[in-house]
Structures are given as C-alpha cells and as structure tokens.
C-alpha cells in the first residue's frame, strides 16, 4: 500500500500524528488506550504493536496486562483471554530480546 499510494499513506500517517497530539495524553497513555481499542476490534497484530509501543513509552508489563483485563466486561472472558495471550506473547518476546 505504502509503495503504491505514497501520498495517501503520508496523509494517513499525518492524521495519526495529529490525533496523537490533539490532546493532553502522553505516549504511554495513548499506547495503552490504543491497546484497548485494538483488543476491542480483535486485531491481534495491532494488540502486539501497541503492546510494544506501550513498553517503549515506559509502561510496565503489569500496566499493559491491566489494560487487557479491563476489557473483560465489554468483550467477555474468552476474548479478553485471547487478547491477554497476545500481550503475553509480546512481553515474552520483549524479555527474550533483552538478553
């Protein structure tokens, strides 16, 4: 997509930047919120991505897991557990990458 439609992709990227800076949330809060949004949409790749971004922004593993736990009453237990497993995969990989 990026190679075929570079102008459209650039506009999309700019929209994301503008949305991120339009209010008072910091990078960690944004990443945790986006993790929850990705969980609600059941987008596994996005959960992994926003989990990594949350770590990079200074979120602890406990904070990221808590963000997923909050989805239980909205998504239901099975969906929350699936999202939590995606988070745990990402956290495990991040921990292995440290060594």
Language-model-detected regions and their locations in the chain:
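Residues at alpha-helix boundaries and short interhelical turns
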Residues: 2, 23, 40-44, 58, ...
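Short alpha-helical scaffolding segments that buttress acidic/His motifs in well-ordered protein cores
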Residues: 12, 16, 32-39, 67-74
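Acidic, glycine/proline-rich low-complexity segments that act as flexible tails and inter-domain linkers
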Residues: 1-30, 56, 82-99
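Aromatic- and histidine-enriched alpha-helix N-cap/loop-to-helix transition segments
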Residues: 27-28, 62, 75
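Mid-chain, well-packed structural core segment of small domains
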Residues: 40-69
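C-terminal structural segments of small proteins and small subunits
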Residues: 65-90
């Amino acid at each position: 997509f990026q190679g075929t439609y570079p102008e459209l992709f650039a506009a999309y990227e700019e929209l994301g930047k503008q949305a991120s800076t339009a209010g008072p949330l910091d990078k960690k809060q944004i990443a945790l919120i986006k993790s929850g949004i990705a969980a609600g949409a059941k987008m596994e790749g996005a959960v992994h991505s926003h989990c990594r971004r949350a770590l990079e922004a200074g979120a602890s593993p406990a904070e990221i897991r808590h963000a997923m736990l909050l989805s239980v009453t909205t998504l239901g237990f099975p969906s929350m557990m699936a999202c939590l497993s995606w988070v745990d995969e990402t956290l495990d990989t991040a921990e292995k990458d440290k060594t």
